[in-house]
Amino acid sequence: MKFAVLVFPGSNCDRDMFNAAIKSGVEAEYVDYRETSLSGFDGVLIPGGFSFGDYLRSGAMASVAPIISEVKRLATEGKPVLGVCNGFQILTEIGLLPGALLHNDSHLFISRNEELEIVNNQTAFTNLYEQGEKVIYPVAHGEGHYYCTDEIYQQLKANNQIILKYVNNPNGSYDDIAGIVNEKGNVCGMMPHPERALETLLGTDSGVKLFEAMVKSWREQHV
């Protein structure tokens, strides 16, 4: 298995994503936003940061980068796509995930560890966690308030697309939502950073199982 780790101007978690992929036992390669092909890749990791300086709004300029059409193609083919923080914002901007990310209710940048609950462990991203398991991931965002219409929220609930919730909501997200998947279950976006939760020495290794789950799910289908 080989992951593409996208790199935009202003990305700052691409190395963490790369490290997470390698740690889970697969290959990874950085892919510049100006590239036009993801041929040979089995999945996509879209890192956090401030792509294009967050001008216009978070993820807006990245959403029209040349590589995005290929991200959409892989998603349509059912390959795993994970967007974290700014990556989540990009996924909503390009329509692969519903909703939007707004300014935190506090209007402050929040950077700390947060306790989260796995509310759906039947996905390619969470199948190594227990249902209801509590995990610790770092958060680092100013625009992490997940918002959607009531209609979309009911669809998310009905399709079991909400996978991760905040235990103590730090940003005002609708129903404490921290992470969701698309209807097919192969595209995931979350504001917390599992790629920064790989070592107990750094405070938490709760994120290891998320990347291992992605690899496990892929191998079950292809090996």
Curated annotation (Swiss-Prot):
Single GO MF descriptor: ATP binding
PROSITE patterns, per the entry: GATASE_TYPE_1
Transmembrane region(s): none
Pathway(s) of this molecule: Purine metabolism; IMP biosynthesis via de novo pathway; 5-amino-1-(5-phospho-D-ribosyl)imidazole from N(2)-formyl-N(1)-(5-phospho-D-ribosyl)glycinamide: step 1/2
Keywords attached to this entry: ATP-binding, Cytoplasm, Glutamine amidotransferase, Hydrolase, Ligase, Nucleotide-binding, Purine biosynthesis
InterPro entries the UniProt entry points to: Class_I_gatase-like (IPR029062), PRibForGlyAmidine_synth_PurQ (IPR010075)
Subunit structure: Part of the FGAM synthase complex composed of 1 PurL, 1 PurQ and 2 PurS subunits.
NCBIfam families found in the cross-reference section: FGAM_synth_I, PRK03619.1
Protein name, entry field: Phosphoribosylformylglycinamidine synthase subunit PurQ
Organism (species): Staphylococcus aureus (strain Mu50 / ATCC 700699)
